[in-house]
Regions:
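Periplasmic-binding protein-like
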Residues: 155-162, 238, 242-280, 297-312
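Bacterial signal peptide processing site
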Residues: 26-29
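Acidic, polar ligand-binding/catalytic clefts
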Residues: 111-173
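Bacterial N-terminal signal peptides that target proteins for export
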Residues: 1-13
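A ligand-binding cleft/hinge motif common to bilobed small-molecule-binding domains
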Residues: 138-145, 193-195, 223-256
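Extracytoplasmic small-molecule ligand-binding "clamshell" domains
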Residues: 34-136
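C-terminal motif of bacterial Sec signal peptides marking the signal peptidase cleavage site
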Residues: 20-24
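Bilobed "Venus flytrap"/periplasmic-binding protein-like clamshell domains
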Residues: 79-82, 93-106, 138, 156-214, ...
Length: 312
């Protein structure tokens, strides 16, 4: 994802937005209902430490020699996408993806280095060798699988959110002529383009798609009523609702559920299989469930099997 405009009205920003703006996300969200706590969990759960993960020598042996020798995995991500990846009030990079990435690295006997970047440029940076993994709430789709390998780790969909009370009576079925905020590079951009085409084909006005570089800017647009609504991953929308104290609210149910994927540059031997094996091991030993609970992600999106290129 990525946006074109940054706003200076910091007094209006809740802590989650301020955190994202101090540094520089993919699409997803739950595709179905669930009974778990709202995205973001509680302050107590977010401060909980995830137990260290034991190294798996067999998986570690599958890591490329250059990465193993360096002792760390350089991970590209857009740190404006709470609760998945963001910067907290202490300036620390945190989130669901961060904790899972750390656990994956530990399983391979490595550490992590997270590098912040605009979402729309992360996969290109991965291909250019700038990163050794890309983990930033990327939805797995056929277009991305043409250029990278991807390991699934959570199933998410898209949610529609509006200012409190839905003053413009926005609904997913009628976005024609409306100002809808979205992060650049996300699957929601493509979704809105298709919906806008349907509008104009039926003689209605096109959707005014307002694209921004960071998800925090998208959230602020809706919170301050500069935009009439936004589309984003449902865990992210749920978190925005929680962190704004209800200044933003969800309309309808999440839709178009699809798996998030960890992106790996193609043609790196068994490296992708090592990542897949590490994620599966974390699912099997319960670490994955603990990370989901810490960040309050809906368990309906939890996977029992990590797959390599599941749509290929």
């Amino acid at each position: 994802m990525a946006r074109a405009t940054h706003f200076k009205a910091l007094a209006l920003l809740p802590a989650f937005a301020l955190a994202g703006l101090t540094m520089a996300c993919g699409a997803g969200g739950d595709g179905s209902g669930g009974t778990s706590q709202p995205a973001g969990g509680t302050a107590a759960s977010q401060s909980a430490e995830i137990p260290a993960v034991a190294k798996d020598p067999a998986l570690a042996a599958m890591v490329p020699q250059a990465i193993a020798a360096d002792g760390k995995i350089v991970v590209g991500q857009d740190q404006s996408y709470a609760p998945n990846e963001f910067v907290d009030e202490q300036g620390k990079v945190v989130g669901f993806d961060v904790d899972l990435g750390n656990a994956i690295a530990q399983k391979l006997g490595l550490t992590t280095e997270y590098q912040n970047a605009a979402f729309s440029g992360i996969l290109a940076g991965l291909g250019a060798g700038q990163y050794e993994l890309a983990m930033s709430s990327f939805t797995i789709n056929s277009e991305r699988l043409q250029t990278v390998d991807m390991v699934s780790y959570y199933s998410a969909g898209t949610s529609l959110a509006v200012p409190k009370g839905n003053p413009d009576k926005i609904s997913l079925d009628d976005l024609c002529g409306k100002n809808i905020a979205v992060q650049q590079g996300t699957v929601q951009v493509d979704d809105l383009a298709a919906r806008s085409q349907q509008c104009t084909s039926s003689g209605k006005p096109a959707i005014n798609v307002q694209q921004f570089q960071q998800q925090t800017d998208v959230n602020l647009q809706v919170q301050t009523k500069r935009s009439q609504a936004m589309l984003a991953d449902s865990p992210v929308v749920d978190y925005a609702v929680k962190q704004t104290g209800g200044a933003v609210e969800v309309v309808g149910e999440p839709y178009d559920a699809a798996p998030y994927g960890i992106a790996i540059k193609k043609d790196q031997g068994s490296y992708a299989q090592a990542i897949q094996g590490a994620v599966q091991a974390l699912i099997d030993d319960g670490t994955y469930a603990k990370i989901l609970a810490k960040w309050g992600l809906n368990t309906s999106g939890a996977l029992t099997k990590a797959e390599l290129n599941p749509q290929s």
